Curated annotation (Swiss-Prot):
<dbReference type="InterPro" id="IPR027417">
    <property type="entry name" value="P-loop_NTPase"/>
</dbReference>
<dbReference type="InterPro" id="IPR006297">
    <property type="entry name" value="EF-4"/>
</dbReference>
<protein>
    <recommendedName>
        <fullName>Translation factor GUF1 homolog, mitochondrial</fullName>
        <ecNumber>3.6.5.-</ecNumber>
    </recommendedName>
</protein>
<dbReference type="InterPro" id="IPR000795">
    <property type="entry name" value="T_Tr_GTP-bd_dom"/>
</dbReference>
<dbReference type="GO" id="GO:0005759">
    <property type="term" value="C:mitochondrial matrix"/>
</dbReference>
<dbReference type="InterPro" id="IPR035647">
    <property type="entry name" value="EFG_III/V"/>
</dbReference>
<dbReference type="GO" id="GO:0005739">
    <property type="term" value="C:mitochondrion"/>
</dbReference>
<dbReference type="GO" id="GO:0005743">
    <property type="term" value="C:mitochondrial inner membrane"/>
</dbReference>
<keyword id="KW-0378">Hydrolase</keyword>
<dbReference type="GO" id="GO:0003924">
    <property type="term" value="F:GTPase activity"/>
</dbReference>
<feature type="domain" description="tr-type G">
    <location>
        <begin position="68"/>
        <end position="267"/>
    </location>
</feature>
<dbReference type="InterPro" id="IPR035654">
    <property type="entry name" value="LepA_IV"/>
</dbReference>
<keyword id="KW-0472">Membrane</keyword>
<dbReference type="InterPro" id="IPR013842">
    <property type="entry name" value="LepA_CTD"/>
</dbReference>
<dbReference type="GO" id="GO:0006412">
    <property type="term" value="P:translation"/>
</dbReference>
<keyword id="KW-0342">GTP-binding</keyword>
<dbReference type="InterPro" id="IPR005225">
    <property type="entry name" value="Small_GTP-bd"/>
</dbReference>
Length: 685
């Protein structure tokens, strides 16, 4: 049948059928009667299978958008201030969202609510983002917009960024592709810690910042107070703020005209008849069919399919297989021009080749590389092990696939006596670690055991050599150690004044040193502490939210290393060290930590036929000890009287047997026991 269709002349119908077959698209057409303005209309809807093949007629021509009609901007804010909802509203305003997520006028109320929810979370692609209601990965989208003031069409490139401090690296690299930013502030909560951190990131990048006060529809919104906070904190004039409600759509139409009017266009191209191509790589992800897809900002020249480009970082040459923009999904275009943001498919096989901050240029026209980014710096390390040791290979493959979309993770092989083979992984923060573990389970079906998070310590040895320790098991012994330096951070806590005493006590208990205190508008205070990173990567943030009823916010940045009096706490079971339970703690906290640990261990270790001694030691000093008594068999049960020496003989024989068993026996902490220990640690927190 298929061959007959191909051999039937060039009639219109047969030609169309042949084209459809060559495109490998399965299309079903249905006819339905719908009502528009209370009048029946006949609509034809086509449902296509998931094929990414797009004909050349569907490609966008971007050559008409000169740099003066292009605006590149990000949306930055503190977590949960409404960035993604606002971004999706702008996509809806410009007609960029696909119609399939809108629903029809005949949909039920439940269907409409689901449609509304899909629209609000459209830019949150990952399942973990939708479940937690947070943005983890920055998302890019290009919008076409006709400005009513001058009647011109503009190309607006929007980047929705994360708000949590763990993902500030995503924000910083996104800002490098922009000339401006919308600083979104909650009309109820006002300026928070991450609001200030993101503002200064934008300021350091030389961006024009437009303040946007969101959620003005809430009954508790205080717009005038937030305007004053923006003025005091950043120097904005009260009239500079755009007032909106991303939920209801109030004021949304004022944002894009402000973007066009106040954010400068990309720089003019070099005045030359042949401008050499130069582009900045600011993001990438992996597609198993097409390889690495790179998001770029074209600084000069243009790039099209078939061009040969060179990476300034690794000096390798790549052929461009595809070019396009995110509108909102991948949409092919003949070329990308100066000032435009889009994607290219250069045929890279691994994401390691796509180094964020790299410069691309044409093969025969080398250029000066652009200023790049600082690589992501891992702040928290943990051991990750499969629940079943047979799943080690699958876990490694799953991690490698995940790292293709998140290059900020580091991974090295590690072996534990208790848990077997696994990995020592580095993360940007505790939330980042939690998100990665959740993605491993949801996207790859890998349930893992994670050891307590640690931070990297610098150790100066007696021979003058300096080493970096991220695994407590590798901490050097006292006779080989000269000094230890622990990582420090500068933490900024913004809180209502009524919680000041409790928050300061929490910071002091976490070995924080107060360096600054500032009174803000609206009965709020901002305090600055120098913290050891190891004190705040576990339960500090949760405790801060608990004692402040959720109103306090935290932001922190790296502050180098500082000499510290820390020690390694070793755990011994009948004299045998369990490496996976080792920890590095400050000596002032060593005894309290040790007592808590051995008590929890006593609950999860099964009783043996011999006595089990649990010890927590620092050097040769025992900090805490617990004993699990042996199970005892009543060997005298068969004695019904008679000489007492018979009973003593049986008891002495049992005692001698237990002594030999203790010498030869081995106490093992099972994976189930280790998992219970980790859960009890979280419960205690």
């Amino acid at each position: 049948m298929f061959s007959r269709l191909l051999n039937r002349g060039n009639g219109g119908v047969n030609k169309n059928i042949t084209s459809g077959l060559l495109l490998r698209r399965t299309t079903t057409t249905t006819t339905r009667l719908s009502y528009i303005n209370n009048s029946p209309t006949l609509s034809i809807r086509s449902f296509c299978s998931k094929s990414t093949t797009i004909t050349s007629d569907e490609k966008l021509d971007l050559s008409g958008y000169t740099t003066d009609r292009i605006r590149n901007f990000s949306i930055i804010a503190h977590i949960d201030h409404g960035k993604t909802t606002l971004s999706t509203k702008l996509l809806s305003l410009t007609g960029t969202l696909p119609k399939s997520i809108y629903g029809s006028g005949e949909d039920s109320l439940v269907q409409k609510e689901k449609s509304e929810e899909r629209r609000e979370q459209y830019l949150d692609k990952l399942q973990v983002e939708k479940e937690r209601g947070i943005t983890v990965k920055a998302q890019t989208c290009t919008m076409k917009y006709r400005n009513k003031e001058d009647g011109k069409d503009y190309l607006l490139n929007l980047i929705d960024t994360p708000g949590h401090v763990d993902f500030s690296y995503e924000v910083s690299r996104s800002l490098m592709a922009c000339q401006g930013a919308l600083l979104v502030v909650d009309a109820v909560q006002g300026v928070q810690a991450q609001t200030m951190a993101n503002y200064y990131l934008a300021l350091d990048s030389g961006l024009e910042v437009i303040p946007v006060i969101n959620k003005i529809d809430l009954p508790t919104a205080d717009v005038e107070r937030v305007k004053q906070e923006l003025k005091d904190a950043f120097g904005f004039h009260p009239d500079d703020a755009v007032l909106v409600s991303a939920k209801t759509g109030v004021g949304i139409t004022d944002i894009l005209p402000a973007v066009i009017d106040r954010i400068p266009p990309p720089q003019e191209p070099t005045k030359s008849p042949k401008v050499p191509f130069k582009a900045l790589l600011f993001d990438s992800w992996f597609d198993r069919f097409r390889g690495v897809i790179c998001l770029i900002k074209v600084v000069d020249g243009k790039v099209k399919k078939g061009d040969s480009i060179v990476s300034a970082g690794n000096k390798q040459t790549y052929e461009v297989f595809d070019v396009g923009i995110m509108h909102p999904e991948q949409r092919p275009a003949p070329s990308l021009f100066t000032g435009q943001v889009g994607y290219i498919t250069p045929g890279m096989k691994t994401s390691k080749e796509a180094r964020v901050g790299d410069t691309f240029y044409m093969k025969d026209f080398p250029v000066e590389p652009l200023p790049g980014f600082q690589p992501a710096k891992q702040m928290v390390f943990a051991g990750i092990y499969p629940v079943d040791s047979l799943d080690y290979t699958q876990l490694r493959e799953s991690f490698e696939k995940l790292m293709l979309t998140d290059s900020s993770i580091s991974m090295t092989n590690e072996t534990s006596v208790a848990l077997g083979m696994g990995f020592r992984c580095g993360f940007l923060g505790l939330l980042h670690m939690d998100v990665v573990l959740q993605r491993l389970e949801q996207e790859y079906g890998q349930v893992v055991i994670a050891t307590p998070p640690t931070v990297p310590y610098r150790c100066l040895l007696t021979d003058g050599k300096e080493i970096l320790i991220s695994n407590p098991a590798g901490y050097p012994s006292a006779e080989h150690l000269s000094k230890t330096f622990e990582p420090m951070v500068t933490g900024h806590v913004t809180l209502p004044t009524e919680y000041f005493g409790a928050v300061v006590k929490l910071c002091m208990d976490s070995r924080g040193i107060l360096t600054n205190q500032e009174t803000l508008e609206g009965n709020r205070t901002r305090i600055t502490f120098n913290f050891p990173l190891g004190e705040i990567v576990t339960d500090f943030y949760d405790n801060l939210k608990r004692i402040s009823s959720g109103y306090a916010s935290l932001d922190y940045e790296d502050n180098g290393y500082q000499e510290s009096d820390v020690a390694k706490v070793r755990v011994l079971l009948n004299g045998e060290e369990v490496d996976s339970l080792s920890a590095i703690v400050h000596k002032s906290n060593a005894q309290r930590y040790s007592r808590s640990l051995v008590k929890r261990l006593r609950k999860v270790i099964d009783r043996q036929m011999f006595q089990v001694n649990i010890q927590a030691m620092v050097g040769s000093d025992v900090q805490a000890r617990e004993t699990i008594s042996a199970m005892r068999k009543d060997v005298t049960a068969k004695c019904y009287g008679g000489d007492i020496t018979r009973r003593r003989k049986l008891l002495d024989k049992q005692k001698e047997g237990k002594k030999r068993m203790k010498q030869m026996g081995c106490v093992e902490l099972s994976q189930e026991g280790f998992l219970k220990l980790m859960k009890s640690t979280n419960d205690d927190d």
